[in-house]
Amino acid sequence: MSETEVVFDRRMLEALICPRSHETLKYDQERQELISETANLAYPIRNGIPVMLIDEARVLD
């Protein structure tokens, strides 16, 4: 991680839910994604900000 990279604040997990399933999310620090196991989607985190758009989410294998 570079010095200028913004880190995701894990406290945000308490307030965020998956926009598709309305379930809680898990944080994948290595991939910088929020995972919705119910919806089978991974939402990217860019510059420390979760992108909670279904169209931007990656479908999990």
Curated annotation (Swiss-Prot):
Coiled coil: none annotated. GO terms for cellular component: cytosol. Gene3D superfamilies: 2.20.25.10. It holds the Pfam family Trm112p. InterPro entries: Trm112-like. Belongs to the UPF0434 family. This is UPF0434 protein RD1_0037.
